[in-house]
């Protein structure tokens, strides 16, 4: 265990995870999930190797030889995902295609790996063989569980999360800010008079779902006492049948929601079809908002209210960050991309409710999503 911990620390130093000085022992012990005695034994090995110097009253100062630019770097960028490429959304596939094209133009190749998201013994062995030394200049994690994100973080591998990073983990991320979009959507619906608002999320182990639900609940709590409401949050098992089952159960409630916020665009389309099939008028009987966009949504009628961004610009920004990371090894800063609100034709007022002004702190549909990101 001591030698394994020393190897993880060496990888972190080699990839530039720490600059100038090492974090304190408490932080490293929590980060690597090892005891203080194991950590100190591993640090003693690195000290003998000259990785850092110890000065009384100061943290361990890293030696100049640990400059990552002095190390040979791989020309591979590896994407690790819970899904095979063909099961990703159309917009995600376009993003990966553009990323591959731009990486190739910069002298890198893109490799795509789909892996189980449970970290069992067999999965650990597969991951260990995948990340052998110099196998990739950097790793991009897409739709990965907290176990997989923690595994990469603990080994100090040069890692960028495409999406949200799980709470308590210290990895840079590049994401569309779904939490800000959710807060904005709540404000828009609230302004239209909705007080029974439902949120449909996939029952998944991914950080984006957790952040989105938390943002909705926090925004509801931040409303004034007279305006406060309890959101109706439901998780579905995925697929058309799973989404329809949860939607039907919501509509059978004694006080069904007058508006639904749906996280994933394919699920929003399923909800829209289910509502129309069962003769719910959208938006007269119920309003509907999707927190993400996809190419097929251009063909939906009525036009779905949703949050979208220019996918070419998004892919270009992602590629620029990944290429710089792969070339330099320097840990990039996290980037949250704010989508634009497209009102579509699926938001209306509940029957018998007049248009109202938004409560204090609640963004209206005339405000940008940036107002909800603050």
Name what the model sees in each region.
Residues 1-37, 41-44, 68-69, 86, ...:
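Extreme N-terminal segment that seeds HTH/winged-HTH DNA-binding domains in transcriptional regulators
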Residues 5, 172-199, 240-248, 268, ...:
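Hydrophobic alpha-helical segments within soluble ligand-binding/sensing domains
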Residues 185-224, 333-348:
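An alpha-beta-alpha
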Residues 103-117, 169, 198-199, 213, ...:
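Short beta-strand elements in bilobed, periplasmic/extracellular small-molecule ligand-binding domains
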Residues 247-374:
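Flexible loop/turn connectors
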Residues 1-11, 15-17, 25, 49, ...:
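Amphipathic helical "hinge" segments at domain boundaries
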Residues 143-181, 266, 292-304:
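Flexible loop/hinge segments that line or gate small-molecule binding clefts
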Residues 78-79, 133-143, 198-201, 254-267, ...:
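Periplasmic-binding protein-like
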């Amino acid at each position: 265990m001591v030698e394994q911990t020393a190897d993880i620390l060496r990888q972190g130093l080699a990839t530039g995870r720490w600059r100038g000085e090492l974090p304190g022992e408490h932080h490293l012990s929590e980060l690597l999930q090892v005891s203080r005695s194991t950590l100190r034994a591993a640090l003693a090995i690195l000290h003998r190797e000259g990785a850092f110097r110890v000065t009384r009253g100061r943290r361990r100062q890293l030696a100049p030889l640990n400059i990552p630019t002095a190390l040979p770097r791989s020309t591979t960028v590896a994407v690790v995902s819970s899904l095979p490429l063909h099961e990703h959304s159309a917009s995600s596939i376009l993003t990966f295609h553009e990323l591959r094209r731009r990486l190739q133009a910069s002298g890198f190749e893109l490799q795509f790996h789909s892996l189980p998201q449970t970290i069992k013994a067999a999965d650990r062995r597969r991951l260990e063989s995948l990340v052998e030394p110099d196998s990739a200049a950097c790793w991009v994690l897409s739709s990965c569980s907290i176990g997989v994100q923690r595994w990469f973080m603990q080994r100090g591998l040069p890692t960028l999360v495409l999406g949200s990073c799980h709470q308590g983990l210290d990895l840079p991320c590049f994401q569309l800010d779904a939490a800000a979009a959710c807060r904005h959507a709540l404000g828009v619906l609230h302004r239209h008079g909705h007080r029974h608002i439902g949120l449909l999320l996939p029952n998944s182990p991914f950080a984006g779902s957790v952040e989105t639900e938390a943002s909705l609940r926090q925004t509801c709590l931040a409303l004034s006492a007279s305006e406060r409401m309890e959101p109706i949050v439901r998780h579905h098992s995925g697929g058309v049948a799973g989404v329809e089952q949860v939607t039907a159960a919501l509509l059978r409630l004694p006080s069904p929601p007058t508006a639904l916020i749906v996280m994933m665009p394919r699920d929003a389309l399923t909800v829209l079809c289910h509502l129309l099939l069962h003769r719910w008028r959208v938006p007269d009987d119920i309003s509907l908002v999707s927190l993400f966009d996809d190419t097929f949504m251009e063909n939906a009628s009525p036009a779905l209210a949703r949050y979208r961004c220019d996918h070419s610009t998004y892919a270009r920004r992602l590629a620029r960050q990944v290429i710089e990371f792969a070339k330099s090894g320097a840990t990039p800063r996290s980037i949250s991309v704010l989508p634009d609100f497209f009102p579509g034709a699926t938001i209306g007022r509940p029957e018998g409710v007049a248009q109202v002004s938004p409560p204090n702190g609640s963004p209206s549909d005339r405000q940008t999503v940036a107002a909800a990101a603050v």
